[in-house]
Amino acid sequence: LRLLLKLLLLLLGQQKHWPERQQQQQPQPWLDRQQQQQQHNQQLQKQQWPEGQRQQLWPEQQQQQWPEQHQQAQQQQQWPQQQPQMQQEQWPQQQPQVQQQQQWPQQQHRRQHGQQQQCMNSQQQLQQCGQQQQQQLQQQWSEQQQQQQQQQWPEQPEQQQQQQWPEQQQQQWSDQNQQQQAQQWQAQQQQQWPQQQQQPQQQQQQQQQQDLGPDGVGIVVPYLGSSPADFEVQNLGVSVLPRIKLPLPKFDNDD
């Protein structure tokens, strides 16, 4: 048993170290190929471009390639400096447009304000003209009336006024009397109107009381039907039309 265990341990230890040994023993062809390719490329370069030719050709190529690269670098460096110059060159052309855009609402507002002021001024002028015309017309009218009155009323107007005054006074007095009478009549009507309305009601009630009679002299037959038919008076046997006053028969003591 002990031997078997030792053998198993040895086998396991060999299996653990086996891949490392295998890698060490196995060759690596791809590394060799890379090294060989690099060496081959170096040899080709040496053959095609010897050291003297490379030294001779390099300054010319460098001179040709350098200005192009230098120009590009200068352009990149100078571009932010040139940009404001271009903006400054174009700015005077763009500036009037901007000023026009900025000034346009102000000018429009000024125009509108000027038009409003003109309208207000024109309205004020019209009002002033109308007032002046009214004043002129009133003055002319008053002057004409004064002239006509002076023509109609000569130097002695008081006498004519005294002559005409009684007639005018009588007419005015009669007019005032008529107005007062009309007002009094209206007031009387307003006062008498409820009394006149009450009078027919009182008369109707009195007529009904008279028809019935306190002593039983007469009787009223009410209208009960929908058509004017004859009705009999209660306990009398007499056929009468509605609302006709009938005398009651007189009964003797013997009957």
Swiss-Prot record:
Q: Which residues lie within the region annotated Disordered?
A: 18-90, 149-224
Keyword line: Disulfide bond, Repeat, Sporozoite, Sporulation
Spans of sequence repeats, please give. Answer: 18-48, 49-57, 58-65, 66-78, 79-90, 91-103, 104-140, 141-152, 153-164, 165-172, 173-192, 193-210
Q: Where is this region: 12 X approximate tandem repeats, Gln-rich?
A: 18-210
Give the GO biological process terms.
sporulation resulting in formation of a cellular spore
Coiled-coil segments on the chain, per record: none
Q: Where is the composition biased (Low complexity)?
A: 149-210
User: Subunit details for this protein?
Assistant: May be covalently linked by disulfide bonds to other polypeptides to form the 80 kDa antigen.
**What job does the chain carry out?**
Unknown. The Gln-rich tandem repeats may be important for an unknown aspect of the parasitic life cycle. May be an important immunogen.
Protein's UniProt name: Antigen LPMC-61
